[in-house]
Design a protein with these regions (language model features):
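Outer-membrane beta-barrel proteins
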Residues: 6, 25, 32-35, 40-84, ...
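Extracellular/periplasmic, surface-exposed regions of secreted and cell-surface proteins
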Residues: 8, 226, 232-241, 246-251, ...
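A generic beta-sheet turn/junction motif
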Residues: 72, 199-203, 212, 494, ...
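Residues embedded in well-ordered regular secondary structure
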Residues: 3-5, 9-10, 19-47, 85-220, ...
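Switch/connector loops and helix/strand junctions flanking conserved nucleotide-binding motifs
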Residues: 20-21, 67-69, 87-88, 101-104, ...
């Protein structure tokens, strides 16, 4: 439904669209790796206990999604949760215990002796002669494979070793085989508990549920906890008025290492002769995982002086995330006459997300996350970092419509609906990154930019770039979205066989230019319940229990939030200095566009649904054509 925008479907929970936008801080690197809940729990159903779900349905065409208008361009997923019913009190408990075993090292992987022998064969066949020639002319190329190639070529600390010393070192490496799958992964036990209480009478029904889940990841120091509470009360004091109130609360926490090294990839490709620890228990640097690429000239790898050790990354980095989500919803139905009623819905939600990412000063993650260009193998400067985010999101939605339904002469059924909706979302993210962080004291000391040369001169351009890095490491991001919608639908049903429907809708959004804020869409559909025909009765109905032909066409509008109707300035590293102030300069990256309008999707669809043997077997056949109109995409203009 879009090229550059968001094509994700709209999630609707008990009539409330989940569209709580989360601003993204302008910070590079994947900061909160293990559990960034912001979008998961804001736009989907991540915070709902699966045991509370009554049903899930998908609205796929324009006619079916008409009530959600512009938000439905990517489709609609409707989730209905359980509610109380008239009757005795029901208490339900369910619990699960699951065991996940760690990945097992493949029997086809070589052990240390086999790997070293293979590396020696490759050295003898492809590199030994080139190495000997290189000693003479200094220009001959020879490939280095594994630790054997490093030792035989005298790379780094192996320079000057005699052949006997080289053989002794290789033999020592072959005396131990590391199963990296056993070192990095674990067998875990995860549990979940769910308790619900429901019941009521014709005047009032209630539903309460609580849930807890704990998932232990197979990666070391990885865990996830989830708490849920759900409460609903539905009251019907008389035949005229009914109303209900529901509240949902969920809280999630996640912990994991923050290292950006793929542990599954490392476990498979790391050499078996590498060890996680020295004999004295200290971390042992991996000599081959990163270094071989540099030795063979593909690219330069910057490593800290103490080298790379994945166990250090696991133990001395952390990514923690917490999310609390509270939603309060109220609904009412007023039966004005026998055929006319008013339905209202109001919802308010609040989300609070917090993330914290810590890189210990001795880790490779901290080494690669430095505010200035001193990450070479000769630098001895080490310091940690901490990155923290807090996001606060509020959202409200008000919707009301009048619905009229009447049957004429027992063969004509007319349903008419007209309503309006307003919604607003406000989200604010505050982020800060501190270098030189000490996790013991909680303090930090921002490192000074390194001087070059004996006169302690600092290059001005690099110093300005350093200042920009520090400026961008702390700040805030704010998003605000408001919408107003007006809609109407009409359905006509003849003989309970032929169904005609049509809908119109107009949506207004602050995401567009001042001249294009409102967008009108329409849809129309027809369905034929063939199984209601007289010639479908009798023996044929024992085989074909239901058959419906569907035709639908219409438009839906979409909001592409990757483009903006307002002027945007992108700041750079240049300054303008006056007598009293210093201003950062920038360039216009987005010109104002009062004509920026909605993206539209037009679809035509035909479908046939057939149920066999009392609908025990169902067949669905569909054909459709989807067209995108008014798509926003980058275009080069000739000046």
């Amino acid at each position: 439904s879009t090229i550059t925008g968001n094509a994700e479907p709209l999630w609707v929970i008990d009539g409330v669209p989940m569209q709580k936008e989360v601003p993204t801080p302008p910070v590079s690197n994947t900061q909160i790796r293990s559990g960034d809940f912001s979008n998961i729990f804001a736009t989907g159903i991540g915070g709902i206990n699966p045991n509370d779900i009554e049903s899930i349905s998908v609205l796929k065409d324009a006619a079916a999604a008409a009530i959600y208008g512009s938000q439905a361009a990517g489709g609609v997923i409707v989730v209905t949760t359980k509610r109380g019913k008239s009757g005795p009190t029901h208490v339900n408990y369910s619990g699960t215990v699951s065991i996940q075993t760690r990945p097992v090292r493949s029997a086809n992987l070589m052990n240390s002796r086999e790997k070293l022998a293979w590396e020696q064969e490759l050295w003898d066949e492809f590199a030994a002669a080139g190495y000997a020639n290189n000693l003479q002319d200094g220009k001959s190329y020879y490939p280095v494979v594994g630790i054997v190639g490093m030792i035989r070529s005298g790379y780094g600390k192996y320079k000057g070793l005699s052949v006997a010393e080289q053989d002794a070192r290789i033999a020592e490496l072959g005396s131990h085989t590391t199963d990296w799958f056993e070192e990095l992964f674990r067998t875990t036990v995860s549990t979940s508990h769910y308790l619900s209480i429901s019941g009521g009478n014709p005047k009032m029904a209630y539903y309460l549920s609580m849930g807890y889940g704990n998932d232990q990841g197979i990666v070391l120091k990885n865990s996830y906890d989830r708490y849920n509470f759900n409460g609903k009360i539905d009251v019907t004091p008389n035949r005229v008025v009914s109303f209900g109130i529901s509240t949902d609360f969920s809280y999630q926490t996640s912990k994991a290492p923050s290292s950006n090294v793929d542990m599954f990839k490392y476990a498979y490709f790391a050499n078996p002769y590498e060890r996680p620890y020295n004999d004295d228990g200290s971390y042992r640097a991996d000599e081959t995982y990163f270094s071989l690429s540099e030795i063979n000239g593909s690219y330069t790898v910057a490593l800290p002086e103490n080298g790379f050790n994945l166990m250090r990354e696991i133990n001395e980095t952390s990514a923690k995330s917490t999310s609390g989500n509270f939603t309060l919803t109220g609904n009412t139905t007023v039966n004005i006459t026998k055929d006319l009623k008013f339905v209202g819905l109001a919802s308010f939600s609040y989300i609070s997300d917090h993330g914290e990412n810590i890189n210990g000063k001795n880790t490779y993650a901290a080494w690669m996350d430095r505010p200035f260009e001193n990450n070479t193998t000769t630098s001895k400067r080490i310091y940690g970092s901490i990155y923290q985010t807090s996001t606060y999101n509020t959202n409200y939605m008000l919707r009301g419509h009048f619905a009229y339904g009447h049957t004429f002469n027992e063969i004509h059924r007319l349903n008419v609906l007209a309503g309006a909706q307003i919604s607003r979302n406000y989200a604010k993210t505050i982020f800060t990154k501190r270098y030189g962080y000490d996790p013991v004291t909680g303090n930090h000391s921002t490192p000074l930019y390194p001087a070059s040369g004996n006169n302690s001169v600092i290059d001005y351009d690099k110093l300005v770039s350093f200042g920009k890095t520090l400026d961008n490491s702390t700040g805030q991001a704010i998003t605000e979205n408001a919408m107003a919608s007006f809609y109407g639908t009409i359905d006509y049903i003849l003989l309970n066989r032929y169904v005609f429907n049509a809908s119109v809708r107009s949506d207004g959004s602050n995401n567009f230019g001042s001249k294009e804020q409102f967008n009108a869409t329409w849809s129309a559909g027809f369905s034929w319940n063939i199984d209601e025909e007289s010639w479908m009765k009798g023996k044929i109905s024992d085989v074909i229990s239901s058959m419906t032909l569907r035709l639908a066409t219409g438009y839906t509008g979409g909001v592409n939030k990757s483009v903006y109707p307002v002027i945007i300035m992108k700041y750079d590293n240049t300054f303008r200095i006056s007598d009293t102030d210093s201003y950062r300069m920038g360039t216009i990256s987005n010109a104002p566009n009062p004509h920026l309008s909605w993206e539209k999707t037009w679809d035509i669809k035909a479908g046939l649904d057939i149920g066999f043997f009392k609908d025990r077997l169902r067949l669905q056949v569909e054909a459709y054509n989807l067209s995108l109109i008014h798509i926003s995409e980058p275009t080069r203009l000739q000046l």
